[in-house]
Amino acid sequence: MQLKYVDTKEVIIAVNKKSKHIEPHLHNALEIVCVTNGALELGVGQELYHMEKGDIGFVFPDVIHHYQVLTPGVNKATYLMASPFTIAKFADIMQSMAPEYPIIKAEKVEPEVYRVINAILETEQSDITVPQAYLQIVLARCIGKLNLVEKSNVGSNDLIYQTVSYISANFKKKFSLEEMAKDLGVSKYVLNSLISKTLHINFKQ
């Protein structure tokens, strides 16, 4: 596992592609994934959620997640990433809340949502105004179908999750291994070993 933190700006990225294993990572963008063929597993914390064609998954900003492909055959999905700027009035709630169950099953998704996602895929990315308007429709139709809880309740209480969450929360600050270990209530030697062996990060002490 390698920690990846992407600092997105004023951008919406949408692509339909073959699904593959994606290691645990996080970013400050909203991520929406819609399975278009086959199946996909969305991992949030220690939970793994099975998705099939038509299911839509929502990963709010700064939530650790990963993807796995366990189903044989052709598995494809539309992946949409939207920076905090582009999610407008939904930005504040997404900073503090997250879906308790991040999947909306296909039978609960309105046909309009699929049409709008396809429209985002077909929009020229040079003009963000149109895809941003489409995104608001997707969120307006879908957010109400998700049970939102405090973001701290989503994921895992294990040390790996706490460490990645700490790094993401303090991503733009300078902090030492000793400071992080103290804040997490563990030995710096235990923490250093975890970061090196599990996250594959060379932490400068």
Language model segments and positions:
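Short helix-capping/hinge SLiMs at alpha-helix to coil transitions
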Residues: A169-K173
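Basic/polar phosphate-binding segments, predominantly the helix-turn-helix DNA-binding elements
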Residues: L146, K174-Q205
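All-alpha amphipathic helical-bundle segments outside canonical DNA-binding/catalytic cores
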Residues: T123-I137, V154-N157
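Generic protein-terminus/edge-of-domain signal
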Residues: M1-I56, V63, L70-T71
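N-terminal positioning helix adjacent to the helix-turn-helix/winged-helix DNA-binding module
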Residues: V109, G155-T163, L199
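Localized chelating/binding microdomains
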Residues: L30, I167, V186
